[in-house]
Amino acid sequence: MNLEKLFGSKTKVDILKYLLFRRQWVSMRALESELEWTFPAIKKQVESLESANIIEIDKNSTGRSITLKAEVSQLLKELLYFGLKSELINLFSTYEFMIEKYFFGKCFEINLDMDLIVIYKNLEKPQIDKIKESISEIFRWYFIEIVNVVFMSLDEWNKRYRLADRFVLDIMRTRQE
């Protein structure tokens, strides 16, 4: 999913991701330093988001604090997680002969201890490291710095499944809910 095309601006998408996944009650100057966009670009997009009733700007004597409106916050979060999920699926499809299956977890509001579980076949450590780095880059693009990813070989997965391992059974149970 191309969020820039949906929202019409990379700056606007970065502001929304920042407000959803990093912090709220932030000033335009703080956004400028964190997002590395120019102040005029941020000001223009903040005004656009405010006129669209997506954000609120609390103008007090100490400055301006920007927050997402509560009524749109959950919808935006679902949309951005859909975009995140789509990018991960695209990444995994490039390795379709090496990745047997994958499961989305905690950060996708699925009741698992991990955020992402990847079951692989025919992968060596350098390939695993490359995929892990790509996964981290995708999450960082959404301003999600900490992500819990488990890589497990297909042989280990099958062995743990046969032994009724709790971790594997929890994953299978959440898939059926």
Question: Model features per residue range: what roles?
Answer:
Residues 1-100, 106-111, 120-177:
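Catalytic core of pol beta-like nucleotidyltransferases
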